[in-house]
Design a protein with these regions (language model features):
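Bacterial Sec-dependent N-terminal signal peptides
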Residues: 1-21
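Extracytoplasmic/secreted envelope proteins and their assembly/folding machinery
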Residues: 74, 78, 100, 104-111
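Intrinsically disordered, low-complexity boundary segments flanking structured domains
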Residues: 18-24, 78-83, 110-112
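Generic structural motif
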Residues: 41, 100, 127-129
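C-terminal partner/receptor-binding element of secreted or periplasmic proteins
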Residues: 109, 113-142
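A short, exposed loop/beta-hairpin motif centered on an aromatic-Gly-Thr core
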Residues: 88-101
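N-terminal secretory signal peptides
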Residues: 18-71
Length: 142
């Protein structure tokens, strides 16, 4: 009876160890990726775009090749807006790819929506790489 209880208690630890191993294998590291950020609020017409930046040692998801930890990069931009520009509660979007050409194409497409002829009255501002830089997020354990 005591052995059965001991085995039942050890089973979750074994499952957790296996899940941790699988999580490590979910992501893989690439030398670099390209990304830009977009920050907006529903309370005003201010729109912010970062430059297209190269970020070294980026992790991608193994299944689809998406940026792993994308929310962490969005929080980097959100924290910058809150702390440096004193603009709280910004909704931030990160667009990324391992190919610079793909990111630049998406950048131009988004810019057309907010700066083009059909754009509404938005106050579009740019955040240069000298003011804000994305930092790689270690996703090896997640």
């Amino acid at each position: 009876m005591a052995l059965a209880i001991l085995l039942l208690a050890a089973a979750p630890l074994t499952i957790q160890a296996q899940n941790a191993q699988q999580n490590i294998q979910k992501n893989f590291k690439v030398p670099h990726a390209y990304m830009f950020g977009f920050a907006a609020s529903f309370n005003d017409s201010l729109i912010f775009f970062t430059d297209v930046q190269q970020v070294d040692s980026v992790w991608l998801t193994k299944k689809k090749g998406f940026l792993a930890g994308k929310s962490n990069y969005a929080y980097q931009l959100r924290n910058y807006c809150e702390e440096k520009m004193e603009l709280p509660k910004r909704t931030c979007v990160i667009v990324s790819s391992v190919k610079r050409k793909d990111v630049e194409k998406k950048y131009k497409k988004m810019m057309k929506k907010y700066v083009g002829k059909k754009a509404k009255n938005y106050d579009v501002r740019y955040i240069s790489s000298s003011d804000f830089k994305f930092h790689a997020v270690d996703m090896s354990t997640e």
